[in-house]
Amino acid sequence: MKPSERRKARRLAVQAIYSWQLSGNNVADVEHEFLTEQKIDGVDVSYFRELLSGTTTKSAQLDELIMPHLERPFDEVSPIEKAVLRIATYELTFRKDVPYKVAINEAIELAKAFGAEDGHKFVNGILDKIVAKK
């Protein structure tokens, strides 16, 4: 498997989690929508499914790991940054095969692609603190 397949899976997962957060729809429905309506060529679909399922089912646990490092209420964090932080925290916590530097770098790239202008700096700072605490 090429790393780019996982990168594409992460990009799709961020969009799906963002949609789930805003819509409140069932995760299975969000997954189905993304796999049928989005271009999935070159996407590691099983990794996409794991990220979506793992991040959504463990969101409360992930949020508990993220929140102590925030300087503002979690509900004030933009939905896209929340999605990126949740995915990266999932990888840092449950995917020991993913080096922490890779998880953080991928999250920074996702925040640059989808987030606010300096969102990647915010994401980087929070993830660095999470890693330092482990």
From Swiss-Prot:
Bilayer-crossing regions: none
Pfam families given in the database record: NusB
UniProt-recorded Gene Ontology molecular function terms: RNA binding
Annotated Gene Ontology cellular component terms: cytosol
One Gene Ontology term from the biological process aspect of the record: transcription antitermination
Keywords: RNA-binding, Transcription, Transcription antitermination, Transcription regulation
Superkingdom field: Bacteria
InterPro entries (alphabetical): NusB-like_sf, NusB_fam, NusB_RsmB_TIM44
Family label: Belongs to the NusB family.
PANTHER family for the chain: ANTITERMINATION NUSB DOMAIN-CONTAINING PROTEIN, N UTILIZATION SUBSTANCE PROTEIN B-RELATED
Function description: Involved in transcription antitermination. Required for transcription of ribosomal RNA (rRNA) genes. Binds specifically to the boxA antiterminator sequence of the ribosomal RNA (rrn) operons.
Record-given protein name: Transcription antitermination protein NusB
